[in-house]
Regions:
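Accessory RNA-recognition modules of RNA-modification enzymes
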Residues: 2-259
């Protein structure tokens, strides 16, 4: 009986040592892919709150900074700013962060004119002066010319903008959603197909805003069923407006032949 117990204890001890080896950091590291290993070794982790100095602007208008030479993208941050950020995604070569606090503010930062800014996905740079926007666009082209084209960036001339940077869009495409009796009409939220309710956009031609508001009221009055892209059911999908010198064009995109 004693011999049997000793054998059993030896087996348990071996299994315990094997288990410890398999759960060691070295063993876990060996089981990870290169991508997973890179994420594990990143200087920031999901949920970290870090200070980031912004030195550039990304292709979607987000601020670009670095933490220990690791790139961090921060929406609504501007070059020259130091910001406090909550890391909300970590990839192999970069992370993204949510802006918590502006520690050092850029001289050309302003309050956005649109009360839906930051929710609607239509605009990304309303928090900077228009002159600042033009300067950022010029610098973006210079960076591409130099880094990818291997040309002298001084060849790029300053970006020219209109005298009035508002109410210039002559075409509007507005998604429709919600439910029958509670229709929603506006623009998609950033990075999603969730609709931000709003029929008055400051960068749209005023004619398009009139079209949007009229269609919204008519859809409510006649209780038209909005299209649901998840179920594939419903009627009204989009409102399209186009303003030209010869007149206005209004298009209703539906999922059925009749309203």
């Amino acid at each position: 009986m004693n011999g049997t117990n000793r054998t059993s204890r030896k087996k348990q001890s071996k299994q315990h040592r094997r288990s410890n080896r398999s759960n060691s950091p070295q063993a876990i590291s060996g089981q990870l892919s290169k991508k997973q290993q890179a994420i594990l070794n990143a200087p920031v982790k999901f949920g970290d709150e870090v200070l980031v100095t912004i030195h550039g602007i990304g292709s979607s208008g987000e601020g670009v900074g670095r933490v220990d030479d690791f790139t961090v993208f921060v929406p609504f941050a501007l070059p020259g700013e130091t910001v406090k950020v909550a890391i909300d995604m970590v990839k192999k070569t970069y992370a993204t962060g949510r802006l918590l606090e502006i520690v050092t503010m850029a001289h050309n930062r302003i309050d956005a004119s649109c009360n839906l800014y930051g929710f609607c996905g239509g605009c990304q740079l309303q928090h900077i002066t228009y002159e600042g926007q033009l300067s950022l666009k010029t610098q973006k082209v210079k960076d591409v010319i130099e880094r990818i084209g291997h040309q002298n960036p001084d060849l790029v001339k300053p970006t020219l903008g209109p005298k009035e940077p508002w109410a210039y869009r002559n075409k509007m495409q507005m998604p429709v959603g919600g439910t029958k009796g509670d229709i929603q009409m506006g623009f998609y939220a950033m990075g999603s197909h969730d609709i931000v309710q709003g029929t008055n956009c400051p960068i749209q031609d005023e004619g398009n805003n009139i079209i949007a508001q009229a269609c919204y009221q008519i859809a409510k009055e006649f209780d038209i069923e909005p299209y649901d892209e998840h179920t594939g059911k419903g009627v009204l999908r989009h409102i399209i407006g186009r303003i030209g010198q010869s007149g206005w064009m209004i298009i209703l995109v539906t999922a059925t032949e009749q309203l």
